[in-house]
């Protein structure tokens, strides 16, 4: 590798079983004859910055920490950004920023879509991202746009003509835009930089050594540059993990998805036969690692080479899988915990490093969370998505809340975010928001916007009078803060169209205003720390980029704003952010790209499910696989081959390797990765059936035992026995029936004082429908008492009129549209029934919604409201209960379980209803008012009404006596078959637990 004016290509490989960067460092140090000055004169070209850092760390390991002058390193993949490859040369035009390009492309897409009548700004922005990807692919693969028309298959020619017409954006309009603005596409600029460097080195070969290491030459420009480096007087190319042992027939047969496919393609670009590639000096590995590499090589053989499976000795296979373990977890959480436990255990050995390699960012996040349980933060190469950081979440919540016009759920999500302070002390603002929620947002949704909140406040103030003044005062402060901070943005979203840059500026102003505290401006709060700095930089870039996009309808703004965060990661500094510890120096989480060329004593390959690793093959939205090939783009299967190479290298080189997957992801069953399936098949063919990849520790058992209790003692049924002084002395008729069926509910409601908190955005339900029907009929009956019978048509109109007012007050147009016809049918049925009753009985006194109250010995008060009581000609009473739901069975009435109506009759007998006067019931009836095909039905209660009333009163007195005994417990649901169908207190009584039901 010396500077001897050699022109034959110098191509080496470091075998897959050897740690690449450590072997590279050792070889360079040996070639420099351990002379630091000679080493410093070398230039090493590596694929990534992380690989460059890894090489520096490898040199430190080589010298056992002694300082060393290092060779100059160039990160090939980021050469355009760094501007180091072309040092001293004329540079091509600067690269257009990613956001600016997407915004400008979106404007072109919008113009196309508007011409077709299907314009959508957020869709156009995302489609612009797909076009940008296509542009970069075309640039990297050096595909000629003029060949687009030739790519179509005859069967799809008509469809392809439409696609070509749309792709004029990239073939015609976009090049003109770049030329007008003096810019270049990033990938095209990188290709130009690489090509300029190649030509420069060909014209003026450097005398100092140049080593290009670790690249598989994924794009033609890199391949040409490597070919030039290999022929420099002091140049060399070092390939990662070229399989020199595969026989020629198998080598010729490998396809795009094989691990060696990329290297085979690169050798063709280098003009070098595989037999000409030499092992990197000193890069041999121990027998155990070589055996592992042979196992992996045989496992990955194409079909034509599978005959070699039979030629592998069984003992060699056993040696090859030593240190290799596999775990199939039940789900993602269990997989993450298993990985975290294995990584934590690695720290028990001094100097031992552990790394998780996975393309699954959700799994990486779960592992980070599991490690945090042990007080550890791993060095995560991918960082954290900007949209998932505190400022990113806050900004997204703000846009959602404003786009949904301050609907309760998104509004509260925003107001409860730690960055929201509304110009107050943060703690005071949190307390005010909680009171604001209780006072105005629980229950039915207020009308939209600030005006809707103000109307809800005015309504609550009218109802409250002197009640809850503190809550209403806090609500007023929150509304004022919202008006001050979000008002301009809400106004900007009301126009028909607005420039997106103006909407972004209004969004950022609103975010800063709402983030302000009583002592600090919002900008200081929002843009602080690493995540805030990254968000500020992204928003500044977006402000400039969106100037190049035309006006959009405001309803597109949430989708467009969300797209601004796509693909942006925040990398935390190794020293740790505020509130977080520094990443552990021996624990790593690597993405697939970052893991290339890296090594650790324990490597865990996680997320090995088909569709995740490898990812599902996607040719993209523009062309089919054959069309891509004809056009000159890489086959989608090439990405699988690249991923297979990464897996093969990792499997071959780690002293200890753990392969993990989850059997179910998000509740759905998964399929093992094709590489796991191949490995299983290979091992079964060599060693027979069995569990051959047992990990060194039972990580699965440990993970499952970690949170398992020593023993499970079932909780007995609740048996609260409060003191008599705390037991309720006032119950409604409905509550008496509840006391009979579920005493615990009365205990929770009246003794503990617990009430169900209304839901946010609580939907209008059947209870509201029942209230509407009851109120409408009661109003008509009261009016009839004053004015007399008006006739069927008028009586029906009275019911419909009051019902319409009640429905309108619910402010639920969809429900109103459904219920109005039903109400009309009920009104007609009730009016006709009333006319028939008059014809049969003549006029009677009818009382509607009659309140009654009965004071009993011992200070107990029984109260209730009867739907309707008629005093008949003989002086007896008829009680009618309207039901829009289910009517109780006759058997339960006779057994005094359904006692509400008979108990009202007993109260009437005792003079509880002052408006009606004392009287004995002679008739009890239910009116089923559904409003459907059969609008109503009368169901008289069978049996003697007075006797049923007496039985109900006896049951009531027995209940009273029972719960006047201090030893009597308020059991939950003592008779399950008689229990209420619905209850707000089942979870408090833990019925499912002691009742044997599923949680």
Predicted region positions:
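Polyanion-engaging groove/track-forming segments
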Residues: 1-787, 792, 800-813, 829, ...
């Amino acid at each position: 590798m010396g500077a001897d004016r050699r022109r034959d290509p110098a191509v080496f490989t470091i075998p897959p079983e050897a740690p690449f960067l450590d072997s590279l460092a050792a070889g360079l140090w040996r070639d420099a004859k351990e002379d630091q000055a000679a080493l410093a004169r070398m230039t090493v070209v590596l694929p990534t910055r992380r690989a460059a850092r890894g090489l520096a760390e490898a040199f430190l390991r080589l010298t056992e920490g002694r300082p060393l002058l290092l060779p100059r390193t160039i990160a090939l993949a980021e050469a355009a950004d760094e501007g180091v490859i072309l040092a001293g040369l004329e540079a091509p035009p600067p690269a257009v920023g990613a956001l600016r390009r997407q915004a400008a492309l979106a404007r072109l897409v919008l113009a196309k879509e508007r011409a077709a009548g299907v314009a959508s700004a957020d869709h156009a922005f995302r489609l612009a991202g797909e076009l940008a990807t296509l542009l970069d692919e075309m640039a990297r693969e050096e595909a000629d746009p003029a060949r687009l028309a030739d790519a179509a298959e005859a069967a799809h020619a008509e469809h392809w003509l439409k696609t070509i017409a749309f792709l004029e954006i990239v073939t015609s309009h976009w090049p003109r835009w770049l030329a007008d603005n003096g810019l270049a596409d990033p990938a095209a600029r990188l290709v130009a930089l690489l090509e300029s460097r190649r030509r420069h080195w060909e014209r003026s070969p450097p005398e100092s050594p140049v080593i290009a290491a670790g690249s598989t030459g994924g794009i033609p420009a890199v391949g040409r540059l490597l070919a030039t480096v290999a022929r420099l007087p002091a140049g060399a190319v070092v390939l990662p993990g070229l399989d020199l042992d595969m026989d020629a027939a198998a080598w010729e047969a490998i396809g795009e998805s094989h691990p060696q496919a990329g290297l085979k393609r690169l050798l063709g670009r280098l003009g070098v036969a595989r037999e000409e590639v030499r092992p990197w000096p000193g890069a041999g590995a121990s027998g155990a690692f070589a055996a592992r590499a042979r196992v992996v090589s045989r496992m990955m053989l194409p079909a034509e080479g599978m005959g070699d499976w039979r030629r592998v000795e069984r003992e060699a296979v056993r040696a090859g899988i030593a240190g290799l373990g596999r775990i199939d977890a039940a789900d993602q959480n269990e997989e993450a915990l298993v990985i975290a436990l294995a990584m934590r255990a690695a720290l028990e050995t001094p100097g031992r490093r552990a790394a998780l390699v996975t393309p699954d960012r959700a799994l990486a996040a779960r592992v980070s969370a599991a490690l945090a349980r042990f007080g550890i933060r791993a060095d995560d190469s991918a960082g954290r998505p900007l949209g998932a950081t505190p400022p990113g979440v806050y900004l997204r919540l703000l846009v959602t809340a404003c786009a949904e016009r301050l609907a309760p759920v998104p509004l509260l999500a925003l107001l409860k975010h730690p960055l929201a302070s509304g110009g107050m002390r943060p703690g005071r603002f949190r307390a005010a928001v909680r009171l604001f929620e209780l006072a105005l947002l629980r229950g039915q949704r207020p009308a939209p916007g600030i005006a809707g909140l103000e109307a809800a406040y005015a309504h609550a103030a009218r109802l409250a009078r002197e009640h809850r003044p503190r809550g209403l005062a806090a609500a007023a402060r929150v509304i004022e803060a919202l008006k001050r901070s979000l008002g301009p943005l809400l106004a900007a979203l009301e126009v028909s169209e607005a420039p997106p840059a103006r909407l972004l500026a209004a969004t950022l102003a609103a975010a800063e205003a709402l983030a302000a505290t009583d002592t600090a401006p919002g900008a200081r709060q929002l843009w602080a720390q690493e995540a805030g700095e990254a968000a500020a930089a992204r928003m500044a870039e977006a402000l400039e980029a969106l100037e190049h996009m035309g006006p959009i309808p405001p309803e597109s703004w949430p989708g467009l704003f969300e797209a601004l965060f796509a693909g942006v990661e925040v990398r935390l500094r190794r020293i740790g952010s505020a509130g977080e510890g520094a990443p552990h120096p021996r624990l790593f989480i690597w993405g697939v790209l970052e893991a290339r060329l890296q090594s650790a004593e324990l490597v865990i390959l996680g997320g090995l499910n088909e569709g995740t690793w490898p990812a599902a093959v996607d040719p993209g939205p523009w062309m089919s696989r054959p069309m891509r090939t004809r056009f000159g783009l890489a086959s989608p299967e090439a990405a699988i081959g690249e991923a297979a190479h990464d897996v093969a290298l990792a499997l071959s080189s780690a002293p200890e390797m753990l392969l993990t997957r989850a059997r179910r992801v998000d509740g759905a069953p998964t399929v093992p990765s094709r590489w796991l399936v191949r490995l299983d098949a290979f091992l079964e063919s060599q060693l027979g059936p069995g569990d051959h990849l047992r990990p060194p520790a039972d990580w699965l058992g440990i993970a499952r035992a970690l949170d398992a209790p020593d023993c499970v003692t079932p909780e007995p049924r609740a048996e609260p026995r409060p003191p008599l002084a705390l037991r309720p002395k006032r119950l409604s008729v409905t509550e008496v029936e509840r006391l009979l069926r579920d005493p615990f509910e009365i205990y929770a409601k009246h003794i503990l004082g617990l009430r169900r908190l209304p839901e946010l955005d609580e939907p209008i339900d059947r209870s509201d429908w029942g209230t509407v029907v009851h109120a409408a009929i009661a109003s008509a009956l009261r009016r009839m008492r004053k004015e007399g019978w008006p006739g069927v048509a008028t009586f029906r109109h009275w019911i419909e009129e009051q019902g319409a007012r009640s429905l309108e007050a619910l402010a639920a147009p969809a429900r109103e549209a459904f219920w109005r016809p039903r109400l009309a049918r009920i009104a007609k049925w009730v009016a006709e029934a009333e006319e028939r009753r008059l014809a049969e009985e003549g006029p009677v006194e009818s009382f509607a919604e009659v309140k009654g109250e009965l004071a009993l010995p011992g200070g107990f008060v029984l109260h209730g409201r009867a739907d309707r009581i008629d005093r008949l000609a003989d002086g007896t009473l008829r009680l009618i209960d309207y039901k829009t739901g289910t009517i109780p069975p006759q058997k339960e009435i006779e057994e005094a379980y359904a006692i509400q109506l008979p108990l009202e009759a007993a109260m009437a007998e005792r003079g509880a209803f002052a408006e009606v006067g004392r009287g004995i019931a002679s008739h009890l009836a239910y009116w089923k008012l559904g409003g459907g095909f059969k609008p109503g039905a009368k169901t008289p209660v069978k049996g003697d009404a007075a006797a049923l009333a007496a039985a109900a009163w006896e049951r009531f007195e027995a209940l009273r006596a029972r719960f006047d005994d201090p030893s009597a417990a308020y059991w939950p649901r003592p008779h399950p078959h008689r229990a209420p169908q619905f209850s707000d207190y089942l979870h408090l009584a833990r019925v499912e637990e002691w009742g044997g039901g599923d949680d």
